[in-house]
Amino acid sequence: MFSQTLSKIINRKDLSREEMDRIFSDIFSGNLTDAQIGAFMAALATKGETFEELAGAAEAMRRKATRIQAASPVVVDTCGTGGDGAHTFNISTTSAFVVAGAGICVAKHGNRSVSSKCGSADVLEALGVKLDTQPEVAEEAVNEIGIGFLFAPLFHGAMKYAIVPRKELGVRTIFNMLGPLTNPAAANCQVLGVFAPQLTEMFADALNLLGARRAFVVHGHDGLDEISVCASTRVSELNDGRVQTYDISPEHFFEDRARPEDMAGGTPSENAQITRHILSGKEKGPRRNVVVVNAGAALVAAGKAEDLKAGVALAGQIIDSGKAHEKLEQLIEFTKSNG
């Protein structure tokens, strides 16, 4: 069965969602060798993934994950693929606290850095959030304070079977795409940044197959895997089973475009300070702007704002009210008390 599937991909034939699910179920059950996994990943990357293949792989990974139950019918995630090489501060992580400050349930899925100096887990750890807590603590945080951090290694133990082939290949594969599609709380409203413009529709279509309610899949034309305030952004919006793709520009929300260097991040401690300054209301410039526009999209996805302009305005109000910073402090205290 594996040889037939591999031959199909080598001959540049797409797999069905079910075929992909079967292969990844075998990977995550330890039924394939490192050589087989490596050959499959390389052949798939050469052919190019489809949205059905992405969805099939994500379904297999979701089944193997440690799941948590969110009490809210609306659950937001702001996890992206990473890999944009932009070395910005942690925009999506900071925006997650703004969304939570609006009273929306946030299950922030993330990991340590892969391609930058500081991933979501790194900055949260620098802020004082305890990462190595049991999954039930994350579940309690999501349900009791409205935001929890789902540290990927604690929820996706089956990924251990892909560690060696991924490391030895050393190139980007489908595994670099699965994180935002495999939230352990089954987040159904997302702002999902991707590392290439051609991926926005593919991810939106995959999210649709996976049952998402509403999502904005975004790629800044400056290369950012976020909604950019330095350049226009390609958006594939999933709403009620339909995907629409369009561009938005910073001028739609703000008077001036920012400079790429305004988005620069640094070490985890430096990025933690940036996040605190934004959430406490001290930061009033481009860094705040990029956070409120990304948080604003999440507020629209969650049904809290009518459109992006209203979402941006609401995100700014939440920061100014102190509610976003309060959510950060609550998460820090909760993980320390329950770790």
Curated annotation (Swiss-Prot):
Binding site for anthranilate 2: R166
Entry cofactors: Mg(2+)
Residues binding anthranilate 1, per UniProt: G80, N111
The protein's Enzyme Commission number: 2.4.2.18
Keyword annotations: Amino-acid biosynthesis, Aromatic amino acid biosynthesis, Glycosyltransferase, Magnesium, Metal-binding, Transferase, Tryptophan biosynthesis
Residues that, per the record, bind Mg(2+) 1: S92, E226
Catalysis: reaction(s): N-(5-phospho-beta-D-ribosyl)anthranilate + diphosphate = 5-phospho-alpha-D-ribose 1-diphosphate + anthranilate
GO BP field: L-tryptophan biosynthetic process
Cofactor remark from the record: Binds 2 magnesium ions per monomer.
Function according to Swiss-Prot or TrEMBL: Catalyzes the transfer of the phosphoribosyl group of 5-phosphorylribose-1-pyrophosphate (PRPP) to anthranilate to yield N-(5'-phosphoribosyl)-anthranilate (PRA).
PANTHER family: ANTHRANILATE PHOSPHORIBOSYLTRANSFERASE (PTHR43285:SF2)
Protein name: Anthranilate phosphoribosyltransferase
Organism from which the protein derives: Desulfosudis oleivorans (strain DSM 6200 / JCM 39069 / Hxd3)
Gene: trpD
